[in-house]
């Protein structure tokens, strides 16, 4: 549901000026008696007599000062060093630190994820849970990190096993295109005890390959993933000075409408639907998912629509493993086209 748009009529009326309690009640405040018992008319507001002895602006409130001095620093940190990928290598800081940790310990063999998380804590000033979650996400895509063990399932939404039970290592692709110590700019880690890369000299547009999503302070990003071969062809055309167009490609597949894509710029839209096949007179099969949806969430929406009477469904089977297969069984007399 889109956010509710507010109008001027929805906003409470605020006073343009603040009057004293006496003025608000219609009672005039008594004038201070002058020396000698007489009364003098009030001095003009801008006269020395009116401003003499008036209180100054006073010290700034601690909360206001803290907000003014620290909030911009905090917002800049979240934008630049946490939630948004860097344009040079397409990586968020936690992803860059994970890859650097893998590079330091790389011997061609698998490493326990818990060990990588612990070693990465030397560079990452936040909790170990964020490192583990980012590493699992990179392993699920499989371009930079090769997983071994239960890394969960992006199709069903099943979670990965604990870091002590799963292993990972750098892929050959990552070793080839991501690292080059001779051309890397280094900086001290957050505690000054180690050196980490400012950015990695990636030879491939990683931010378009895996996509990215993050919410910072006053800024958010959502970059959709793209097909590896499409990116290679686009890079070659770009180097040769040829024009090209490229569209997102989703790991969950689906049927996409790019008519309002706007080349990925602000305001563009992509509509993705599940792919549904008619297996028999009273059976439908869902074989592809919209991006960002899981089989569990999709089945829940089907059952909710059935409960509300929008569609008629007998029962639903989820046979998804490496590929999506949701079987929707319809009751006698149901129309498959109407259900779709």
Named regions from a protein language model:
Residues 249, 266-340:
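Charged, surface-exposed alpha-helical interface/stalk elements
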Residues 2-267, 326-329:
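Catalytic phosphate-handling regions of large nucleic-acid enzymes and associated NTPases
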